[in-house]
Amino acid sequence: MVRCSFDKLSSGHTALVRDLLETSEDALAVVEQTDAEGRTPLQWAASSDAKLDIVEALSSAGSIDVNARDHSGWTSLMIASSAGASSIVRWLLQHGADVHASNTKRITALHYASSKNHVDIVRELLEAGADVNALDGANQRPMYVIKSGHPCSLLRPAFSRTHLVY
């Protein structure tokens, strides 16, 4: 059943996911299942704004852990922030996602959004209270992981209202 649910989830078809949840004897168990890397269906859905309907369908199954971590410590918020899935980031923040969570490399969602130059997501995370001075495993702050070759000026205004330590 685990493989079936992940196959339906990764297909991107909301109707398939809803059907799985409606026909399952225990929909919450389907939502809480993990794959070999420890990722939940919510974490797989968090990778694309196109899957917002799937995220909402999964949450309708019952109490869903928006802060669940895979074996590397990644949360759904980190995945969505890295992927540029701004509507998923917004949904996760509205449903209690921890903006301060870091993975096994001490990388936060803000680090990921900054490194990919996802300006709107950086703003969302900062407004939600993300720590601009959080150090990752390489002692880098989010502002300093901005992808080289991209104009830093896009992100500087988002960071300017914060208490960034230089």
Model-derived regions: residue spans:
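Ankyrin-repeat intra-repeat helix-capping/turn positions
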Residues: 12, 49-50, 84, 117, ...
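Intrinsically disordered, low-complexity regulatory segments in ankyrin-centric signaling systems
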Residues: 1-24, 32-47, 56, 164-165
